Amino acid sequence: YYLATVEGNQPRVRPFGTAHIFEGKLYIQTGKVKDVSKQLHANPKAEICAFKSGEWIRVAGELVEDDRVEARQSMLDAYPSLQKMYAADDGNTEVFYFKNATATISAFTHEPEVITF
């Protein structure tokens, strides 16, 4: 999927790989040293977009940092390959969850399905 953030008045989009449900919330992960982290702290509004088998999904909302070790560890457990670069207590690993979010699932063959969470 792709994650879009804002830097000043400029949109920034990049491919992302982590998406994890923890405690019923949709989480993503990054490192505090990355530009995406700085952008989300300055403006938490973000959107992800993915495409598969003729359908696409857009999830728009606010990404809120969860600074608990348990949340970071849950993400790392879901993505073991990340443990080569990150640790839950390394001071760099950061997880965010979607708040006030709307997911829209679309295709050319059906009306959009909208889910809020």
Predicted segment positions?
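Short glycine/serine/proline-enriched coil/turn segments at secondary-structure junctions
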Residues: 10, 54-55
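General beta-strand recognition
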Residues: 2, 26-27, 58, 104
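A short mixed-secondary-structure module that forms the rim of ligand-binding clefts
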Residues: 19-54
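Charged, gly/pro-rich active-site loop segments
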Residues: 58-117
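Hydrophobic/aromatic beta-strand elements that line small-molecule binding cavities or substrate pockets
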Residues: 16-19, 61-63
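Short, surface-exposed beta-edge/turn micro-motifs
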Residues: 15, 24-26, 43-46, 91-95, ...
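A short, Trp-centered hydrophobic/proline-enriched beta-strand micro-motif
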Residues: 1-8, 46-49
